[in-house]
Every structure is written in structure tokens, then in C-alpha cells.
Amino acid sequence: MERKRARGLDRAVEICDLLARACRPMPPAEIARAIGAPRSSVYELCATMTGLGLLEADAEGMLYPGRKTHFWGRSYLAGFDLAREAQPVLDALTAQTGETSQLCVIDGRKYTVLLMREADRAFRISGDVGEPTPIPWTASGRLLLQHLTDHEILALIPPEDFRQPGGETLSPAQFLLELRAAASEGFFSFDSPSDSYTHCFAAAVTGERGACVATLCLVAPREEARARHAALKASLIQHAARLSERLAGIHGAGSLTA
């Protein structure tokens, strides 16, 4: 009975994770196919999760994360020191630069935006919070893996992720060179390979023992980035250092929960 209950819990977590990553409602049949589980079991489990408020269904029976997961998320962020300390820093960075700022981390074998403060622009130039992205496509990827050896980095990144959005392939050797070069400054920037419009800036946020635990980022139009590169870089590094100091203060008090 305990083993069956554990399998059910594993599948419930898998369903929540699938819906969060898909960023769209899904029918139970599609969920079953995606996680490779029997349809009957998934239908039964989804009904239970809906009754508990973990999932909600629209008029067509499409499922999406329930409001209880929203409340859990708010509670998590309230107690998550990195996110709690980062929000005012993001607000200040965007207010000072006029550009979209982000807090980014590694999630499994991908990069993701954890928090974002969007700039007041007529059109959106940034990605979605929580969307998994291949690490080599990102400026942050050159900073977030610096604590790993070359062998560990290449074992972590799926080989297909070195293929860029435009079809060209970034050599693993070149990626490692860029990563090690960025280490001394704790900063990296480049024109985003995901589109022809944006330039991405990333600065390391360090935690205990100086390890990079996250990155603070700016996303700006390429022309704006070229014209203001030095100023944007300086502001980003300053705010990343400020966030690192805030985290160090929490560590010193012995209360960091993340």
C-alpha cells in the first residue's frame, strides 16, 4: 500500500511539473501520454488532485494548476531568501536602467528565469518566467556552471543543446573557453541567439564560499545595449554585488533557507 501511495505521489508531482513547464492547459489523455502512465490511472489521479485544489479544469475538461499551488508558490517565495532579497534589487535595477531585469538559475539541466521585472516598453523583449532554456543559449550559462569541472559541465548539458536556435552549432570547447573567461569578471554579455533584436547581460550573484548561486540579468534592445553598454554593465555588476552582500548577511546570521 505504501509503495502504491508513493507511486501516486510521484505521478502527482510529475503532472504538476508537466503543466508548469507546458504553460498551457492539457487534457488528461495528453498528460497520460506525456508521462507514460496508464490513462485510467491518470484520469483517477487527476480527479483526486482536482478535488484537493491542486488542479482545476475548464469547461472542456482541460487541466491546469489549481489555486492551491499558487498559494504554495507565494508561501515558498515568502520564505525563500534568494527570491525575497532579489525582488527589491530587480525593482531598483530596472528603475535605474529602464531595462528588463531578471534573476536566473539552473533548474536540472536547463536554465530558467526565476523572477523578472519588466521594463516599461511598448513591446516585450524577454522570455517567460520558468521556461526551460538550453544553457549554451544564455549569457547566464557562462557563469552558473563555473563551480563544475569541464567534464561535469559537458556531462550536465545535453549534446543537442549546443545546437543554436538558428541551426548553427556552438562547439563545447568554445563554450568552455567563454565560461572560464567570464569567471574572473563575474560578467558576460552577448547578442541573444534566440532572436535578432536583444542583447543579454549577466552578472554573478554569489552565495556562501563565493560560488555563483544565481545571475542577475538585463535584457535590452541591441542598439540600446551598444550605446549604453558600459553604463548598463556597471549598474548590473553593482546590483549583483548588492544582492550577494545581502545573501552574505543572511548567511552570517545563520538563517539562509534556500
Predicted regions and their residues:
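Extended hydrophobic
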Residues: 168-242, 249
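N-terminal helix-turn-helix
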Residues: 1-79, 83, 241-249
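Amphipathic alpha-helical effector-binding/dimerization core
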Residues: 61-159
